[in-house]
Every structure is written in structure tokens, then in C-alpha cells.
Regions:
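Short, solvent-exposed loop/turn and secondary-structure capping segments
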Residues: 14-17, 94-96
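Conserved acidic
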Residues: 2, 23-84, 92-656
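Ser/Thr-glycine-rich phosphate-binding loops at phosphate-binding pockets of nucleotides
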Residues: 6-14, 22
């Protein structure tokens, strides 16, 4: 059975008098209220159970397992799954209690950079698995509630108020706690009613893609072979998407990287007037539906001549090459350093993560990235040692993408229909959200890493705080990596193809969008090679004009439209953005907590582990900068146009 739980917590904060920073060893946190409800399509407040301490919560969960077990049939052990909306936070209170007290064992934990789930086993053998509902719905409970039409119950919660068991929680405050569990309960029940059993967006979308593309393939049956018969597992897949052998998958992962986020140094921190923005309608779904993608296992060609390799690169859709002794430098400041393959820090110079210069490197490149390299870089030396030639199939996932594109389009019509009922509009919001998840989240599974740094949680008796122990885990391939490589490579090439149309008038790109000057906008509007349409899948859509704009770095810029200023700043909550002033908007800009509080706003909340669990500590914000940069030290160079141009000239001159 599945349930949804939520915790409200309180804390005792102790600050170091010398530094005024939180003393995490002397502070403490604990659960002061909890609520739990079954997953049900029409959540009933009468079904909610509540309590005040983490101990009472775990006791209730233990008893709940036993109660479910009474109704379990045959030899099957009961299954109890509990979802919380932000398990990284809530889970620490559970793990602290069981690891310190010994009331239960942590028998399984799936945690890489983030916590996905964990299973605990009580002393009587009861097992409970906790999942993070944010991995299914990565938005706030408030936004999910609006999507599902759940009205807010009476009540609110004052997070500045200290509450131990002696402090009564009012009915209005309990109403606030109940609200969140009811929202997630309904949303999760809705997903289950649609047949989505997986516990992350990516897994849901990937398995839906399999169901709609390879209806006769049952991956659950194949998974039974994985542990003891890996070759049998591989060959149970349809030929088109049979996972590559381990060594080949591990090697070709070096050809897989994401979208291009790049600020032209020429425009860094420059006050611009009349900039224009375009983005691609569903860039990645378009590549899945409308472009040739690889199928099956590759033909491997050893030690081809450069002429033979280039013939394959430019005449076939899906080719990967191994390149050795690679020394390249960007041609000049007008060209785009859109290569991101792994390099040694002592052999490469990078800006914004992109390669400006490298020497004697090894790379694994798709043919689309190879074309970018030949267009934008001076190649001083290069040897192609292997070519991996894949068969290709166009429209491999067209049925899957077009089905959900139609779902999204139909939902948009209802959302914009003035005659639609509130219930119809609510259903359309849910339908649209699911369609977007399906189209945009499935391909990433194919690029899953094999060697992953996993973290296990331990209790440190000396500090009375939870800690992480890192270890590498190796997994066998269970996805078809070449799909992810070429979906992303095709997407990068589309953005690159737009950028080279405008060259000097290119300002900024971020994965599926570009910003250009007014002169660049005129070039794009008149170019037969720039496909613009307000709706069509894969076409560029015009987002609008920025009256003024300032771009500081990747994912950090400000613009005005209709006399209203907007900030896009990665990692900054809305309260921080409201505190920003354009005169100070530059690398190294600091917004102190005092400045934020003067405006009546809340600072950025950072989790700090303390005895008992976690405290969310308010902090200010700083736009990062690059200090003490040296060539070939493995760090990015500053976004400085003069330095950028000088480095390129000097490095190219060294080879003449």
C-alpha cells in the first residue's frame, strides 16, 4: 500500500558569538507535527492520522505495516511505501532517529547527488520504503494543488515559532499540515490510475516510451535475467534498442553531453538595447520524432584514413569517432567553442565549460560534434583511430511523441477556451503537465552513467550528526546509450546552425534558446535557413524583444519588457531576485541577509545537518566569479572578451 506523509519541524539555533554563524553541533532540530494519509483519488481528511514526534511517527508506521500484513495473502510479504515531498529533508529526521536509537536498520538507500528512496527494517521484521514524491512532481505542493484544483484548507504555519510537545498546535495549523499530504495523495493516485507505477519522472516517461514503441517487449521479464545472465538480459531487448556491451557503453559515454549554454564574451556585462529571444518548440522531442536515430549495434572500423573517416562522418546520420593526439584552438573570437568533451585540466583551456584550446587530447565525438569542430576550430593535429557506424531509423519514436503532442495541443485549446468549465480546465492542466513530462523526460534514461558515486548515510556518535560516506558503484547497461548521444547532438547542432547565421550578433544561448541583437534578428527573419513558426514541433518560436538587457554569465541575466525588469539567476529564489538592483548586477555581486530582511523578504534557505535532523538556515547570495586563473590549471577562464581574444591569438600563433 502507498501513503503520503509530511513533517513540520522546529529547532533550537545556537550561533557562534565570534562569527555569528550557526553552531551546528550545539543547535538541534526535531519533528513537532506529522500527518499521513493513504494515496487516494479523493483524499478524505478523516483518513489522516497525525502526531507530534518522530518516535510516534515511526511507531505508527511500524504498526501500520503489521496491520497491512494481517490482510496479505499467501507467502507474499506486505509492501508499505510512504512518500514525502522532499525526502532529502524529511528523510534526515527518520534516519537520525533510527540510526541513533537502533529502533530500525537502514537496509537500502538509493542516493547519488540526491536521495531517491531508502528502506528501513524494524526489529520485528517490518519493512518500509520511503520515496521522494518530488522526483515524480518536481514542483511545490502549492503548484500541484492548483493543477489538481485542491483548495487550500484553512490555516497557515509560522516557521519562526518554536514548538515542542508542550506547545499546542491549533486546528488551523493542523489544517496547513493536512493540506500538503492531501495534494500529493491525489496527484499520486491520479498517476497510478493512469498506469504509471514508476517513482521518478524519467522512469515513468521512459517506460511509457517503451510501451508505445515496443508494445510486445516486457522489460520486467528481461530484468529478471540481469543479475545472473547479463547477455540474456541484453538479448531480451528489441534489436533496435539492445544495450551496448559494458566496455563499449562506458567508452561511448564520453560522446554524451548536454545542451549549450554560452554567453558571447563580447556582450558580457554590457548594457544592451533591443535584444531578441527565440526558443525551439520541444527541441528534444522533435529530434526523437523527426530525425534519424541509431538502432542496433555499431559496425566498428579500425584505423581508417582521415579521408575514409570524413566520408562516413559527412554521409551517414549516426557516426561516432575516436580521436587521439587532438590539438585544437578556436579559430577566432567570432567562432563558437561549442565542444564540451572531457579533457585533462593540464591540457585544455576552457571558458564557461567549453573548450577554447586543448593539446594532445583524446576525444569521442558524434559526427555532428565533429562537424562543429571542423567549422569552428583550427585543428593542429588529429588522428582518428576508430569509427562506430550505426544503422539509423527516422521517426523511431514518432508515435510516442506525436501522441503526447496531440495531448498537449488539446489541453492548450481547453485552457484557452473561455467556455470551458473549471473542471475541464483543471483536467487540461493535468493532461498538459503529463504530456510535457513524457516528451521531455524519457531520453535522459538512455544516457545513464555506469559508474556512479553513491552515498550511504551514517550516524557520527561524536558529533551527533548524520554524515555521508561516498563509494563508487558499477551498474551494467540497461538502456540504449546511442539514442541519448544523438538526440542531444542533433539538438546542439540545431542551435549551432542558428548561431553561425548571426556570428557577431549572437549574444547568448541556453540549450534550446538564443538571444541576438536587433541586427541579428533581421538576419534571422530573412534567412531561409532559420525555420520560424509559432507552434510547429522543432521550429524556432519568437519569444519577444527585450527593451534592455544585461548578461553576466551563464543562466544569469536581466532584461526589461514593457518597463518591467526581470531577472534570471540560477540558484536564486524569488526573494533574492526581488532584492537585486541592476547597478550592482555583475560578477561578484553580493546581497547580504540584512539587505534582504530590510525589504521584508526571506533569504536563500540552505540545509544544515544538526543533531536531530536538518535546519534550513537563511543566507545571502553572491554571483560567482573566477579568481586567480592560470592557463592549464583545470579551471574556467574569466568571461573577459579581451583575454578571450588574446588567448586564441596566442595559442594559434604557437602552432605556426
Amino acid at each position: 500500500m502507498e501513503f503520503v506523509a509530511d513533517f513540520e519541524t522546529t529547532s533550537v539555533r545556537v550561533y557562534d558569538p565570534k562569527t555569528n554563524k550557526l553552531d551546528k553541533l550545539k543547535s538541534k532540530a526535531f519533528v513537532c507535527a506529522w500527518a499521513i494519509i493513504p494515496v487516494e483519488i479523493n483524499p478524505d481528511p478523516e483518513h489522516i492520522q497525525k502526531g507530534r514526534t518522530i518516535q510516534s511517527f515511526l511507531s505508527y508506521v511500524n504498526n501500520l505495516y503489521r496491520e497491512i500484513g494481517k490482510h496479505a495473502s499467501g507467502k507474499h510479504h506486505p509492501k508499505l511505501s510512504i512518500y514525502t515531498h522532499n525526502l532529502k529533508f524529511d528523510g534526515d529526521f527518520i534516519l537520525y532517529e533510527i540510526l541513533k536509537s537502533g529502533t530500525a536498520q537502514l537496509i537500502n538507500e538509493v542516493r547519488e547527488n540526491v536521495l531517491y528512496n531508502f528502506t528501513i527494517k524494524f526489529l520485528d521484521g517490518s519493512e518500509v520504503t520511503f520515496f521522494d514524491s518530488m522526483k515524480i512532481f518536481p514542483i511545490s505542493a502549492e503548484k500541484i494543488g492548483k493543477m489538481y484544483g485542491i483548495k487550500k484548507l484553512y490555516g497557515d504555519w509560522d516557521y519562526t515559532k518554536y514548538r515542542d510537545e508542550s506547545v499546542e498546535i491549533t486546528s488551523q495549523e493542523w489544517g496547513y499540515v493536512f493540506h500538503d499530504v492531501m495534494i500529493i495523495s491525489k496527484a499520486l493516485a491520479d498517476y497510478r490510475s493512469r498506469g504509471y507505477r514508476e517513482n521518478t519522472q524519467a522512469a515513468i516517461a521512459y517506460n511509457e516510451r517503451l510501451r508505445r514503441t515496443y508494445a510486445k517487449f516486457n522489460k520486467l521479464v528481461a530484468m529478471r535475467l540481469k543479475k545472473n545472465n547479463y547477455e540474456g538480459f541484453r538479448k531480451a531487448f528489441p534489436f533496435d534498442i539492445m544495450p551496448l556491451p559494458f566496455d563499449l557503453h562506458k567508452h561511448l559515454l564520453m560522446a554524451y553531453f548536454g545542451g549549450i549554454s554560452w554567453l558571447n564574451p563580447k556582450y558580457a556585462c554590457v548594457d544592451l538595447v533591443d535584444a531578441h529571444s527565440y526558443d525551439v518548440h520541444s527541441m528534444y522531442p522533435d529530434k526523437m520524432a523527426n530525425f534519424p536515430l541509431p538502432v542496433g549495434q555499431p559496425v566498428i572500423i579500425e584505423n581508417p584514413t582521415l579521408e575514409e573517416a570524413r566520408r562516413l562522418i559527412y554521409n551517414y546520420d549516426c557516426v561516432i569517432v575516436d580521436v587521439e593526439d587532438l590539438s585544437i584552438t578556436l579559430k577566432d573570437e567570432r567562432h563558437f567553442p561549442f565542444l564540451m568533451f572531457p579533457t585533462l585540466g593540464t591540457k585544455s583551456i576552457r571558458m564557461q565549460g567549453k573548450i577554447i584550446d586543448c593539446k594532445n587530447e583524446m576525444a569521442v565525438l558524434s559526427n555532428w560534434d565533429f562537424k562543429i569542430m571542423e567549422s569552428e576550430y583550427n585543428i593542429h593535429s588529429m588522428k582518428i583511430t576508430k569509427v562506430y557506424l550505426f544503422r539509423s531509423k527516422k521517426g523511431q519514436y514518432a508515435n510516442f511523441i506525436h501522441f503526447f503532442m496531440e495531448q498537449k495541443t488539446a489541453a492548450d485549446k481547453v485552457r484557452n477556451d473561455p467556455n470551458a468549465t473549471p473542471e475541464e480546465k483543471q483536467n487540461a492542466e493535468v493532461q498538459r503537465s503529463i504530456a510535457k513530462v513524457m516528451m521531455n523526460s524519457s531520453y535522459g534514461k538512455d544516457g545513464t552513467k555506469l559508474i556512479r558515486q553513491c552515498n550511504s548515510t551514517i550516524y557520527n556518535k561524536d558529533s551527533d550528526i548524520l554524515e555521508q560516506q561516498a563509494k563508487d558503484e558499477i551498474a551494467m547497461p540497461e538502456y540504449y546509450l546511442p539514442s541519448a548521444i544523438f538526440i542531444c547532438a542533433r539538438a546542439r547542432f540545431q542551435l549551432f546552425s542558428a548561431a553561425i547565421l548571426v556570428r557577431d550578433d549572437f549574444i547568448y544561448s541556453d540549450t534550446d534558446s538564443i538571444k541576438v541583437t536587433s541586427e541579428g534578428n533581421e538576419i534571422l527573419k530573412n534567412s531561409p535557413y532559420f525555420d520560424v513558426d509559432p507552434y510547429r514541433l522543432g521550429a524556432w518560436g519568437y519569444e519577444g524583444k527585450y527593451d534592455t538587457a544585461r548578461f553576466v554569465r551563464q543562466k544569469t541575466y536581466s532584461y526589461t519588457q514593457n518597463d518591467e525588469r526581470h531577472y534570471t539567476v540560477c540558484g536564486a529564489p524569488e526573494s533574492i531576485k526581488k532584492s537585486m538592483k541592476i547597478d550592482d548586477f555583475k560578477p561578484g555581486m553580493i546581497i547580504t541577509l540584512e539587505q534582504i530582511h530590510e525589504m521584508g523578504l526571506e533569504g536563500r534557505l540552505l540545509p544544515v545537518r544538526v543533531p536531530g535532523g536538518v535546519i534550513l538556515e537563511e543566507t545571502g547570495f553572491q554571483i560567482s566569479t573566477v579568481d586567480n586563473w592560470d592557463e592549464y590549471n583545470g579551471r574556467n577562464m574569466p568571461i573577459d572578451f579581451q583575454l578571450f581574444r588574446d588567448i586564441i591569438k596566442r595559442k594559434n600563433a604557437n602552432y605556426k
